[in-house]
Amino acid sequence: MSTVPVVQGAGSSNSAQDISTSSAPLTLKERISNLLSSTAFKVGLVVIGLLLVITALIFLVSAASFVNAIYLGIPAILGCVNICVGILSIEGHCSPERWILCKKVLKTSEDIIDDGQINNSNKVFTDERLNAMDGVVESLSRRNSLVDQTQ
């Protein structure tokens, strides 16, 4: 069995994108930051959230005869939060329209999960709690948009 020697010095057509061996390796914080800011990660958050919601709803429908089947709603709530985090972080900043959409998704999903009706009987995602988070979302959005401008 013979081996083929590796060709030295052959450049690629996109040599400007080649990784230089003389550059310092990325720190763990930089690697995690790059991963969390990638579009694939953000789309993955939305997909995982949808899978959690669908799975929880399948189990809730089949467990409707059980008395304490509410614990099966936990993955659905986590999935809705996961979807909203994905929506908010798709382009690095959160517009007021996106935040309003996320508030509606969270409130409606809790309404459907708790008693199957949209009757505004929320206990977790109430208007007061979601409105209290407006400042946090706005400051995170400003911070992310400033980071995007510097890059």
Curated annotation (Swiss-Prot):
State its location(s): Membrane
* Entry-linked InterPro entries: CRPA
A Pfam family recorded for this sequence = CRPA
Topological relation to the membrane, as annotated: Multi-pass membrane protein
Query: Highest taxon of the source?
Result: Bacteria
Positions of the UniProt region annotated as Disordered: 1-20
Q: Record's Gene Ontology CC terms? A: outer membrane
Query: Is Magnesium included in the keywords of this UniProt record?
Result: no
Q: Does the keyword Cytoplasm apply?
A: no
User: Where's it mainly located?
Assistant: membrane
Q: Which UniProt keywords apply?
A: Membrane, Transmembrane, Transmembrane helix
Residues spanning the membrane: 43-63, 70-90
Q: What is this protein called?
A: Sulfur-rich protein, serovar E
**What lineage does UniProt assign to this protein's organism?**
Bacteria, Pseudomonadati, Chlamydiota, Chlamydiia, Chlamydiales
